[in-house]
Amino acid sequence: MKFTKGYWMNRPGVENADCVQIREIKVQRNRVYLYAVPYAHDTRAMGGPVLELFLSSPKTDIIRIQAFHFMGSAKKDPRFEIELEDLPLNVEEFEGGLAIRSGKTELKITKNPASFTFYYEGKKLTNIGDRFGHAMISTLQTPEGPFM
């Protein structure tokens, strides 16, 4: 990728599949599973990879997001132990999205277009979402292979 015209542009041979819409949400006590696709229209059933986003709270005030595409079963290196308390999440669904809380941290997610906004003690920290038509979470297909 290169940076020109005020935003990142793909080099020749690089295709990206952006996280545009969250199609499905599964809520459990300690985890939230999001399944995102690279298209915005509900009538479309195919046309790109599905990104799996797993949300959990390893410690109070922390919301962990893991993104996967073709998780597979092979063990990846390097590996290291992470201290996880696996705390329950406070999840509140609303029209068009959901809010997830862990202690004083809150994550508000909208489904279409997909966006993620982080708050701490009610103050906005950062957000990830659709900017200038380019999503901030995506998979890349390059001549060297797939990347995320």
Please state what every model-predicted region is.
Residues 1-148:
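N-terminal accessory segment at the very beginning of proteins
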